[in-house]
């Protein structure tokens, strides 16, 4: 697949890049993407939820009333789950939600996500750009020139750049990350992939 390279003004540079078919042109595996995204979201969960059982609730050590002679059903504790203020039966307990996915499946999922974006025409390749100072407006102007100012956009860069990162972190609907760190979820969550030209080499090295 061929894509025209744009400059920061939104016009064509005359240069064309070729996207590798084994990364951007494979048959999309929805199941692989499902497994990878599910594991990514599950692994973000802390799993620190906790409800106290009857043995953990404060109080309830004394028998509420004598065993016989009151006419009531016998009770051994005021912290029984049937009482208000009592423990919880089968409540949530701390545990890990971690889900493991094989490396080959994760690789297939990322390739499938990139192929889905490419087939939908949602990949924009732009010349590499940097800023001399941390300024949001020049960054916002670039997105506007490219017609991406109102869309959820993921900018993929070849390497981390503090100035670019800080310039864009206050722009709504924009995420910035290095090309080797973008997960299946990151790619699918965005509406458009804005890829710096030299980041394509990073993608080839990571997923090739």
Curated annotation (Swiss-Prot):
Any Gene Ontology CC annotation: ribonucleoprotein complex
Cited SUPFAM superfamilies: Ribosomal protein L4
Bias (Polar residues) ranges: 69-80
InterPro entries: Ribosomal_uL4 (IPR002136), Ribosomal_uL4-like (IPR013005), Ribosomal_uL4_dom_sf (IPR023574)
Annotated stretches, region: Disordered: 45-95
Subunit record text: Part of the 50S ribosomal subunit.
Function: One of the primary rRNA binding proteins, this protein initially binds near the 5'-end of the 23S rRNA. It is important during the early stages of 50S assembly. It makes multiple contacts with different domains of the 23S rRNA in the assembled 50S subunit and ribosome. Forms part of the polypeptide exit tunnel.
Protein name: Large ribosomal subunit protein uL4
Species for this entry: Chlorobium chlorochromatii (strain CaD3)
